[in-house]
């Protein structure tokens, strides 16, 4: 919608800069085991699409970036910070035996996993409030047959946090807990850590430009400021390299990531979202791209290049 508005109005010819519109897949880093298999096969390097775009060099000549995310309710908003994370694929290996006739001859990998999860819960009181830690594992395989002692149990989890040092501190505690489960019953455990997403830090000057347009379109009473959110996005990796923003547009009902989530106000979610992005692009690139250049000039990147960014993930994971 934003692309059509800028193009068919002819305003794009009056702007001092180029605008690229990307459709980037895989913003949600679910299906950890499947994506791990793609990484193992060399088909991808990261869980998220925007990280992959960075690694492939598509961001090398981009100065600023923005995306917009749907949200429940009638309100829109700009965001400041949110969590980053690392992902874990956990494989407990036990020994099969007849679950009724000779369970003492087996090693129950499900018991190992359950103890590991309980040990994670015992660590929660050690997570600092300011780190906004979230750990939410799921068991993706609990065994094969009900009458066989489980010998193959698999767990996926994220360890989220506001800063990467906080994430890594919590991650070490989670690993100890998972290893304790295996030790308790004599099982083996393999923990594979996969780069997740960097924490988001929306550029404030950029946010201000976007917020003014939201005020015009929906009224300031419908514009919120979302701060220190526990959720994550692969856009955080973009925001560590170039000035970028990840605002929210209302128009949905239901819970985020829930089966009842659906569009309730198409006008707000589709049309207003497109207008807000197009208006912001005009504000950035009008008058010799004065505002865009100011934002770029004042931006302090976490990583100054793609190479520095990739090296940082490599160091964090080893």
Indicate residue ranges for each PLM-predicted region:
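DPxDG-like acidic metal-binding loop motif
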Residues: 1-4
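Metal-dependent amide/peptide-bond hydrolase catalytic core
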Residues: 114-318
């Amino acid at each position: 919608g934003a692309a059509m508005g800028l193009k068919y109005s002819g305003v794009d010819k009056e702007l001092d800069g180029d605008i690229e519109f990307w459709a980037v897949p895989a913003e949600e880093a679910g299906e950890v085991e499947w994506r791990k298999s793609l990484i193992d096969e060399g088909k991808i390097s990261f869980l998220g699409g925007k990280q992959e775009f960075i690694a492939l060099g598509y961001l090398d000549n981009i100065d600023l970036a923005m995306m917009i995310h749907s949200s429940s309710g009638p309100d829109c908003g700009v965001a400041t910070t949110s969590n980053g994370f690392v992902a874990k694929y956990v494989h407990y290996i036990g020994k099969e035996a007849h679950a009724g006739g000779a369970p003492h001859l087996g090693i129950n990998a499900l018991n190992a996993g359950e103890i590991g999860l309980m040990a994670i819960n015992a660590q929660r009181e050690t997570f600092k409030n300011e780190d906004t830690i979230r750990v939410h594992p799921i068991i993706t395989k609990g065994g094969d047959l009900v009458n066989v002692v489980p010998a193959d149990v698999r767990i996926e989890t994220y360890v989220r946090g506001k800063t990467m040092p906080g994430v890594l501190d919590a991650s070490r505690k989670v690993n100890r807990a998972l290893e304790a489960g295996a030790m308790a019953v004599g099982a083996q455990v393999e923990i594979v850590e996969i780069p997740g997403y960097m924490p988001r830090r929306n550029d404030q000057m950029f946010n201000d430009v976007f917020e003014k347009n939201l005020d015009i379109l929906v009224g300031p009473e419908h514009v919120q400021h979302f701060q220190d959110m526990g959720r994550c996005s692969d856009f955080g990796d973009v925001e560590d390299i170039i000035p970028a923003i990840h605002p929210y547009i209302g128009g949905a009902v239901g819970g985020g990531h829930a089966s009842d989530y659906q569009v309730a106000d198409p006008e707000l979610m589709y049309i207003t979202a497109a207008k807000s992005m197009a208006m912001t692009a005009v504000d950035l690139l009008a008058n010799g791209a004065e505002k865009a250049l100011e934002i770029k000039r004042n931006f302090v990147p976490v990583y100054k290049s793609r190479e520095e960014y990739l090296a940082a993930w490599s160091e964090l994971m080893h």
